[in-house]
């Protein structure tokens, strides 16, 4: 069933109703013919659109096709007023229902919040009861029970033994230290001599080549004694200082050489004069030392040449003696065979 049409305030029917209310209901209603014709067309159209009006709201004269237009219009207005009242009541009821539902829902939420607050208060009360401050016990071993504890430990493990005294050794610590230093000392490594090596000798023998026996190295025992006699630590050797060697302070000379130009710019004239005198004296000492060591070097070179010539003469003399001895032995052997 289609709902009855709702008339707006701009409709001519409601306009008539408002005019009646403003006149207090005593003035007569003047209907425009054009408005009445349009209203009639609207009513006819609504009736053609299956618009039904509640029959008990209309009187028996409304069902009569021949009726006065004014009375019919008044009845339509009353029916629309009834419809408006019905819709307003329905709207008010829906609002009241929604309000009650919201009130009930808010009441439920409030109840839940109260329950949560009560639970939290109960939990807080329990938590306050559970957390309490207490003093941390301090373990101390000072008491009457310490002696009893020590007696019990001694009865189980026995009395503690006194440490044994170490007798003084009869060995000399200085001698032990010197032996230890020799033991941990790195050996002196020498460059291998390929011409006198045994590997070269074996290689030449296997290849069938002639070998000079004088080029062979001595036996390992002889080699060890030879090396031990030849290896001398230079740090343990102190050269005797000659009497005629001039004196030179090498540390002072190095300090003078390290002074730069910037350090001399801020000095006074007197300090610069003293510095020049010190430089001249140091330079004179250095020249004397250089001349002395140059002479020593030249003398050492001359001695070296002399020793080399002597050694060369001795080698040549030994070769001549060897050759003469071989010739003598060969002559003697030939004479004996004859």
From Swiss-Prot:
Subcellular location as annotated: Cytoplasm; Nucleus
Protein name in UniProt: Uncharacterized protein C8E11.05c
Biased composition (Acidic residues): 59-68
Biased segments, Polar residues type: 24-38
Recorded GO CC terms: cytosol; nucleus
Organism: Schizosaccharomyces pombe (strain 972 / ATCC 24843) (Fission yeast)
Primary subcellular site in the record, as a coarse category: cytoplasm
Biased amino acid composition, Basic and acidic residues: 49-58
Superkingdom classification of source: Eukaryota
InterPro entries in the record: YBL010C/LAA2-like
Pfam families: YBL010C_LAA2 (PF17104)
Keywords tagged on the record: Cytoplasm, Nucleus
Annotated spans, Disordered: 1-72
Keyword set includes Ligase: no
């Amino acid at each position: 069933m289609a709902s009855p049409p709702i008339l707006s305030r701009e409709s001519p029917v409601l306009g008539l109703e408002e005019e009646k209310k403003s006149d207090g209901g005593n003035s007569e209603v003047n209907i425009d013919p054009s408005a009445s014709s349009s209203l009639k067309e609207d009513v006819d159209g609504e009736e053609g659109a299956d618009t039904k009006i509640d029959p008990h709201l209309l009187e028996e004269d409304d069902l009569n096709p021949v009726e006065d237009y004014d009375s019919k219009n008044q009845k339509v207005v009353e029916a629309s007023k009834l419809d408006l009242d019905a819709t307003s009541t329905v709207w008010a009821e829906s609002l009241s229902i929604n309000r009650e539902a919201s009130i009930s829902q808010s009441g439920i939420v409030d109840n839940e919040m109260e329950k949560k607050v009560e639970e939290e208060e109960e939990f807080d009360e329990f938590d306050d009861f559970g957390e309490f401050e207490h003093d941390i016990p301090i373990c101390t071993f000072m008491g009457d029970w310490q002696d009893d504890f020590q007696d019990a430990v001694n009865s189980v493990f026995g009395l503690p033994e006194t440490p044994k005294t170490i007798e003084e050794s009869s060995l000399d610590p200085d001698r032990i230290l010197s032996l230890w230093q020799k033991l941990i000392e790195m050996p002196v490594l020498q460059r291998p001599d390929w011409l006198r090596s045994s590997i070269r000798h074996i290689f030449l023998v296997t290849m069938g080549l002639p070998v000079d026996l004088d080029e062979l190295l001595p036996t390992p025992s002889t080699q060890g004694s030879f090396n031990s006699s030849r290896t001398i630590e230079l740090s343990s050797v102190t050269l005797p200082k000659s009497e005629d060697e001039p004196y030179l302070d090498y540390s002072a000379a190095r300090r003078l050489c390290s002074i730069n130009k910037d350090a001399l710019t801020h000095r006074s004239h007197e300090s610069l004069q003293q510095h020049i005198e010190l430089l001249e004296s140091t330079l004179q000492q250095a020249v004397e030392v250089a001349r002395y060591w140059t002479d020593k070097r030249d003398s050492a070179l001359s001695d070296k040449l002399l020793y080399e010539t002597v050694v060369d003469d001795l080698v040549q003399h030994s070769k001549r003696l060897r050759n003469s001895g071989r010739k003598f032995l060969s002559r003697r052997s030939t004479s004996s065979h004859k």
